[in-house]
Amino acid sequence: KYDMSMLHRDAHETVERLGRGFPIVWLTGPRQSGKTTLARATRPDLAYVNLERPDERAFAQEDPRGFLATYPDGAILDEVQHVPDLASWLQADVDVRRQMGRWLLTGSQQPAIAQGVSQSLAGRVGRVELLPISGRELARAGSLPTSLDTLLFTGGFPALFDRDVSVHDWLGNYVATYVERDVRMLTAVRDLD
């Protein structure tokens, strides 16, 4: 197994570069592709806020101005798709204080947050899409599977390299969770059976 927190992702420099040119960087991509790990590795100087936590999410939803004021130097706002209305408040915040790279948002690409970011933050946000680990990234880390078949079957999700879990078990559960959570939300399907 390999410590994925030590893996240098190709998107690292892109996050840094966009942070010099935009007040907000939005790191998006599929679930479990390493967004949180990359955000924390790229910007260890920023406070970290996990909006999956019900208390943090409630604070951001109920008092967005107070929530953002809690982080005068900015923060990593992880799983920002849970508070899509925050985009308008971030717009107002960065229009007053134009410091570059102050906010680093992470979240899965979902229509609600994508629409909010596109409408409210145009010209204020640099977007980086983080895909699962590439063959080049694995080769650089010395973790490239020995056969192309293994690489294609395994894919590049970090959990498959740093956990003791079979590819079959992990991918089966990943797909099931995706269908149950994301597809239902996107299509408003009530019964997937």
Residue ranges and their predicted role:
Residues 111-127, 140-143:
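Short regulatory helix/loop adjacent to the ATP-binding pocket of P-loop NTPases
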